[in-house]
């Protein structure tokens, strides 16, 4: 039995949900998001909360039960508060700046890396060594942050590179003479 799926998803103030068949559409102050659930679960709005129930006791139905409930919760958090990923840049000469909708990264290559901001996400660089990725879609925000980090992952010897804020990089000792 799914313990996650049992809890109903409360709708915060200013957020409305509408169910059409297996699709739930959530509207809030930051925008609108929708999600289509599989046929293994049913969606219902009861007393200002979205309730997800399985259609059977098969293994797949129980898996989809918890996953669907988590997805609905992510929709409500996204349209009410939004999601945010912060990145730090460490290294001599490594820096980031915004030029319109393009993030320009100087990461020690012979050329600057230009990263176009995708639709549905806002990228900002409050400092030269900080990048903030924000949006209402948790998966898209995380993927964009991972794509930026991929240009120069933190290396274990000096710790240079792009890392998530608060990420601990495993450090290695250099060669001994």
Swiss-Prot record:
SUPFAM superfamilies: Ribosomal protein L6 (SSF56053). One of its GO terms (molecular function) is structural constituent of ribosome. The keyword Transmembrane does not apply. The keyword rRNA-binding applies. PROSITE patterns: RIBOSOMAL_L6_1 (PS00525). GO terms for cellular component: cytosolic large ribosomal subunit. Coiled coil: none annotated. It holds the Pfam family Ribosomal_L6. Keywords: Ribonucleoprotein, Ribosomal protein, RNA-binding, rRNA-binding. GO terms for biological process: cytoplasmic translation. InterPro entries: Ribosomal_uL6-like (IPR000702), Ribosomal_uL6-like_a/b-dom_sf (IPR036789), Ribosomal_uL6_a/b-dom (IPR020040), Ribosomal_uL6_bac-type (IPR019906), Ribosomal_uL6_CS (IPR002358). Belongs to the universal ribosomal protein uL6 family. Part of the 50S ribosomal subunit. PANTHER family: 60S/50S RIBOSOMAL PROTEIN L6/L9 (PTHR11655), LARGE RIBOSOMAL SUBUNIT PROTEIN UL6M (PTHR11655:SF14). This protein binds to the 23S rRNA, and is important in its secondary structure. It is located near the subunit interface in the base of the L7/L12 stalk, and near the tRNA binding site of the peptidyltransferase center. This is Large ribosomal subunit protein uL6.
